From Swiss-Prot:
Forms a cyclic heterotetrameric complex composed of two molecules of XerC and two molecules of XerD. It is found in: Cytoplasm. It comes from the Bacteria. The gene is xerD. This is Tyrosine recombinase XerD. GO terms for biological process: cell division; chromosome segregation; DNA transposition. Keywords: Cell cycle, Cell division, Chromosome partition, Cytoplasm, DNA integration, DNA recombination, DNA-binding. It comes from Corynebacterium glutamicum (strain ATCC 13032 / DSM 20300 / JCM 1318 / BCRC 11384 / CCUG 27702 / LMG 3730 / NBRC 12168 / NCIMB 10025 / NRRL B-2784 / 534). Residues 1-92 form the Core-binding (CB) domain. One of its GO terms (molecular function) is tyrosine-based site-specific recombinase activity.
Amino acid sequence: MKARVLAKTWLTHLAVERGLSANTLSNYRRDVERYCDWLEAAGLDDIRDITTAHVESYVKDLRRGIDGQQALSASSAGRALIVARGLHKFALMEGEVAADVAADVSPPAMGRHLPDTLSINEVALLIDAIPHSDIATPVDLRDRALVELLYGTGARISEAIGLAVDDVSEMPEVLRITGKGSKQRIVPFGSMAQQAVREYLVRARPALSKGKSHALFLNQRGGPLSRQSAWAVLKKTVERAGLDKDISPHTLRHSFATHLLEGGADVRVVQELLGHSSVTTTQIYTHITADSLREVWRGAHPRA
């Protein structure tokens, strides 16, 4: 069977049988199409003709850059390999091949990359840069509610914009957030985030709403706020705050986790709040706090 035909069947399987989110499916589709393009350029149309050496060459080409395209980082090439592995595993499961040629291909070596975070003062500067008094516009109040919720709950941007009005209408002390793979988790809904969301619901959302969407966060046309628009909100807020940092919505999630650990929270509690399936993913934040402690020690200890 042609690899591209099998890839389409596999994506359908992921959508129907695995229930992957639209965003995750979009990422898988992009990566598997890139893999199929590479295979066809190498004269490997049939899934049965591919060997382990071919998969290894694909990963190396990703790191070098394919056909003048920008080279991928080790982590991005590793994710692309995961998709290629998934396709070959599916080929074996469907009886199209006798062996999984990608199973033993190693991902590119990665150095430890610590996520960017904000200090507690920088978070305060970011939030306070958004007007919230009587001069605040409906968009200002929406933006403040979004940023407060992202930092206050550690939600991913896709999770935050996926919230409905009914999820927060009674201002519960905890929020039920739907994450990757439609998995739900419970996170505390703190007083500052509640206050910002309440003010948005009372003073701003009715002005934005055209009565056609149940989404919590709306754009100026009354539709659900998109991921791209949410990124733009944060970029505008960073400029207002005068912060000379490259800050994304995920930076607030990283900061949420780091500040919890610095405050003494158990790493497994933080794992649950973030919705990580493995504590190993969460433990990267313990490296951040350890690095911070070392910097304080170097500056303060007489024997440093």
